[in-house]
């Protein structure tokens, strides 16, 4: 489904991020809702900001690791 790498990054980042550390993901223009769902399933992350490119397309998401 093209999202498996995001699931892996979100899972493995927990092992290296400190509390309040940032996880910044570059995403495809049509992936925001799916990525938000992955992050929301992992309660340790809080979405801080959604980033758009100059064309107004979704291009990134910033979240904070809140700890295990």
Q: Where are each of the predicted segments found?
A:
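S-adenosylmethionine
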Residues: 1-67
């Amino acid at each position: 489904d093209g999202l498996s790498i995001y699931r892996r990054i979100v899972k493995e980042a927990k092992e290296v991020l400190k509390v309040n550390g940032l996880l910044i993901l570059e995403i495809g223009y049509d992936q925001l809702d799916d990525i938000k769902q992955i992050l929301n399933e992992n309660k340790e992350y809080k979405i801080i900001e959604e980033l758009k490119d100059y064309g107004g397309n979704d291009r990134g998401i910033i979240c904070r690791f809140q700890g295990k």
